[in-house]
Design a protein with these regions (language model features):
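Donor-nucleotide binding loops and adjacent catalytic segments primarily
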Residues: 24, 202-287, 297, 317
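A donor-sugar binding/catalytic signature common to diverse glycosyltransferases
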Residues: 120-123, 277-319
Length: 381
């Protein structure tokens, strides 16, 4: 049965769109007619890959050069705040999340009659689930965060309840992660039995192909990702530590566009790496330093690379904590902790390598993208 499928994804980081792109390509190859919604950088990336791509208002945390500011983000839920736009190098007023949410919903709704989807698939986009419920469109939710319990402000609990109300209306919930006890996003998903979601949830495995790939140990690889403020915070933490090491370091600054490269000490800095360049850098790394984003977690699993996580927001903090519990990673929050983590990881490299190999062996049993496609294609049966 061929369907008209609407896919909408959150643009908080690029992890959501990195899942939607291969999923959309696979579904399109199966003959389904695809329509895509997102905002910000995610919208730009979707436009490069597909034709039916619609722009909607992005929803974002309040962040500056120090990263995400929790207190300001709480205020910004309901009130606009001044914010320096680092991409455009000017002071602007950031609209409240309430304003962004309302406008995003109407952006989605504007084209719903013309698209007339048979199914709506949302990756981290609660507005799309709300639209599906209001317009009685069957829906599938893709998420690695449902009821976060690690580093998440208690003030946001009422918002979690609203989210859960829409999630419970889905036909199916796809978690692109390993089943327990090796679920990387365990601390961000929560107790599904208590939430009454167990019957709808399936852990399909990561969308990244985790078939083992052997490489060398030539350098330390630090792929930086996220919004400008997050990237700025990571750069300020990383470079002062890495430039003093004897080991070669490769740093990707996560800025899409024309590639520009330079050197600081023993560090190679690249504004952007192609998929092939990134894979090569990951494959030949001794270990990886990153923020703890879910997609990159599974890249480290694919190449069996131990890591150091420098989380900049609660979801990443939860992922980092789980990897640390599995003795596959070390969490660092500042330059001092990063320096100690590098020393510890180099000293105990063999032990961490063994743990990562065991995690890779378990993860490679699952083909998350294949299973997600099966679930979506049979969701209307």
């Amino acid at each position: 049965m061929y369907m008209r499928i609407l896919l909408s994804c959150s643009e908080l980081g690029l992890g959501h769109v990195s899942r939607i792109i291969p999923l959309g390509k696979r579904l399109a190859a199966h003959g389904h007619e695809m329509f895509f919604f997102s905002g910000g950088k995610a919208h730009e990336m979707l436009q490069k890959e597909f034709t039916n791509v619609y722009k909607c208002t992005p929803i974002s945390w309040y962040e500056n050069a120090h990263g995400i500011i929790t207190s300001a983000s709480l205020v910004n839920l309901f009130f606009p705040l001044p914010l320096f736009n680092m991409d455009k190098n000017r002071l602007e007023i950031k609209n409240s999340n309430a304003w962004e949410t309302i406008h995003r919903y109407y952006d989605l709704r504007e084209n719903i009659h013309d698209i007339a989807p048979d199914l709506l698939v949302a990756d981290g986009d609660i507005n799309a689930l709300r639209l599906a419920q209001r317009w009685k469109i069957p829906s599938v939710y893709i998420a690695n965060m449902i009821r976060p319990s690690y580093g998440f402000s208690a003030f946001l609990s009422p918002g979690e309840r609203v989210v859960e109300r829409y999630v419970k209306k889905c036909s199916k919930i796809i978690i692109p992660d390993n089943p327990p006890p090796y679920t990387i996003s365990e601390y961000s998903i929560g107790n599904l039995d208590r939430l009454g979601l167990n019957a709808k949830v399936e852990y399909v495995g990561g969308f990244v192909d985790t078939t083992p790939v052997k490489g060398s140990q030539d350098h330390i690889f630090a792929p930086i990702s996220g919004p400008p403020g997050t990237r700025g915070k990571l750069i300020k933490t990383l470079i002062p530590v890495l430039e003093k090491l004897k080991t070669k370091c490769v740093i990707s600054l996560g800025t899409p566009g024309k590639k520009v490269s330079t050197k600081i000490g023993n560090c190679e800095l690249h504004t952007w790496l192609s998929d092939e360049e990134r894979q090569e850098a990951m494959r030949n790394a001794k270990f990886v330093i990153f923020s703890g984003g879910h997609a990159t977690c599974f890249e480290t699993i694919k190449y069996s690379k131990p890591s150091i996580c420098i989380p900049t927001q609660p979801e990443q903090l939860g992922n980092a904590a789980k990897l640390q519990d599995l003795k596959c990673s070390i969490t660092a929050k500042n330059k001092s902790q990063l320096q100690k983590a590098v020393v510890k990881l180099e000293k105990e490299q063999e032990s961490y390598n063994r743990n990562m190999s065991a995690l890779n062996e378990f993860s490679s049993k699952f083909k998350g993208l294949d299973r997600a496609v099966d679930i979506i294609e049979t969701s209307l049966d």
